Amino acid sequence: MLRTLVTFLLLALASVAFAEDGARSEFTDSRDGRVYRTVEIGGQVWFAENLAYAAKGSFCYGGAAKGCSERLYPKDVAEKACPAGWRLPSNDDFQKLYGYAGKTGVRSVGNALKAKSGWDRNGNGFDDFGFDAKPAGYCESRKKCEYRDCFLSMWSSTENISWSLYCVDEDFNKGTYSKTAALSVRCIKE
């Protein structure tokens, strides 16, 4: 009982301590009129959802050219996909997000960034900061896609580096992919 109370109090204090972060807003992409939710985390302003702009060379999970709410991008397309005033985050940007989200010490970074719903295998998170990371899968090629409801990997601008969340893992992991793999994009404000 005491342990539960202490955990609850720590969560409440963490929520208050980080209340000034998590400032939410919206951004309208002038290229297609789509409105994106944004959130400030640790002094950085991020899209609070995956990019869905239909840049040439991007595609929907499974290879379709259109008709989806989010898209996957090979590395060369990802590097130019964010709208004016926004950019593909660097490895340093992701490291800063990781460090900030890990400061609470109450739960894992992955669970703090994952959305509260949408993940298979009981992989939902707590979305402590409004990042709202939802699974989108990835594609090794246009027709070879996997893990739609269990995996999110986001390109960084740093050579072949991506950051990923898994439904069966509570961390936020740095990894590498071939430049031809198609991953999600989260834009960060310049």
Where are these regions (language model features)?
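Conserved positions within compact, well-structured domain cores
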Residues: 20-190
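Sec-dependent N-terminal signal peptides
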Residues: 4-13
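NAD-dependent ADP-ribosyltransferases
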Residues: 1
